[in-house]
Amino acid sequence: MKVLLDTHAFIWAITDDRRLSPRARNVLASSELWWSVVSLWEAIQKAQAGKLSLPLPASPFLSGELSSNHVRLLPVSLSHVLRVEELPLHHRDPFDRLLIAQGIEEGWPIVTADPWFARYPVDVIW
C-alpha cells in the first residue's frame, strides 16, 4: 500500500518520536512511503524559523533520511494544485491543503495526527 506522510509523521518516524502512534508505526513498517515535496519545503521553512530542531542543516539531513529510509518524494502536479480549489476551507494551512489534495488525487491515505484531515474525503491513518 502506498501512503503519504504528513510533515510531522515523517519527522517523528525518523527521530523515533514517541508521539508516532502504534498504528502509524505498523503502517510505516509495511507500506510504500511517500513524502510530498510540499512537506519537505514546510520542514525546511520550520527549521529556518527555529520551529524544528534537526541534528544537521535541514536540506542534507532530510535528503539523507529520505534516501536511507526508502521514502519516495511526491512532486506537485497541476492536478494536485487544481484540486486545492475544490476543497472546502475547513483547514486553512496551505501546506496541509495541498497535501490533502495530493492524497485525494493519488488515492493514497495520509498518515497524520492532524484531526482536520478527517474533514476531507481522504483516508487518514493514525
Which functions belong to the PLM regions below?
Residues M1-S36, A49-G64, E106, P115, ...:
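Short, well-structured N-terminal submotif of metal-dependent ribonuclease cores
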Residues W41-E42, H80:
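Short, basic/glycine-rich phosphate-binding loops at helix/coil junctions
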